[in-house]
Amino acid sequence: MGKKKADLNLDLIDLYSNLLNEIWGKASELIGETLLAFFILLTIKRTPDKSSILREIRVSEDGISLEAVRKQCQDASPDDVHRALQGLVKNLFNVFTVTTENVINRELFSKVLPKLREAEKMVSR
């Protein structure tokens, strides 16, 4: 039998938290923490999120925290959690495409794609 919804949500959040922190580490080296924080906050506001999960993400010059998301999403649908966080990552890459002419995307694509696929598999089980 599959995992309980709350456990699956926590696993998804852990995966996306690690992914977003990897993105943070590399992208902040290239464009700086302040500009990256601005891009992420802008992306959060522009990403559709019917479950309101993205509103709980905390962004500062120190990085990204999904701790409040962990607390809020216990009863959320794993599909909603995945869609919201996947949408954030995809839209952030769109911002990087426009603002850095794919420089950041080229650096991160090989790390991000396998994790997005892993998240898809987790939700589809």
Name each region found by the language model.
Residues 1-125:
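Long, compositionally biased intrinsically disordered regulatory segments in eukaryotic proteins
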